[in-house]
């Protein structure tokens, strides 16, 4: 089931220029790396009118695949060091990863887990 996945995709969306701050925080929480994508928010005018503040439309999306057991620590570290109340303005959410291909470090850990299960 999705609840029993071994890995999670952590998605952090930060204001442009703050990906290093977000990644440092994530690494302090246990992340081993990530991928940064540059993006632009849409529908910002309406959000600005609703919130009454100026919003930065240029964003950076930081993608981190981590073990499910590390997810909460990584997300908490990001929010503590670069969260929505900071200049980074980061929001974070996660999605279950049901399978991977080409992520060698994750595949190695999966192989080790299978070997451990077979030896017990």
Named regions from a protein language model:
Residues 1-120:
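Positively charged, small/polar-rich N-terminal and surface patches that mediate targeting and assembly
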């Amino acid at each position: 089931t999705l609840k029993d996945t071994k890995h999670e995709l952590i998605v952090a969306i930060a204001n442009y220029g703050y990906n290093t701050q977000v990644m440092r925080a994530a690494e302090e929480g246990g992340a081993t790396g990530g991928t940064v994508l540059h993006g632009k928010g849409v529908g910002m005018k309406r959000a600005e009118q609703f919130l009454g503040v100026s919003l930065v439309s240029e964003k950076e999306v930081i993608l981190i695949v981590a073990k499910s057991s590390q997810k909460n620590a990584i997300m908490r570290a990001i929010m503590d060091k670069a969260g929505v109340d900071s200049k980074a303005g980061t929001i974070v959410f996660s999605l279950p990863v049901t399978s991977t291909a080409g992520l060698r470090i994750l595949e190695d850990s999966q192989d080790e887990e299978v070997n451990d299960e077979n030896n017990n």
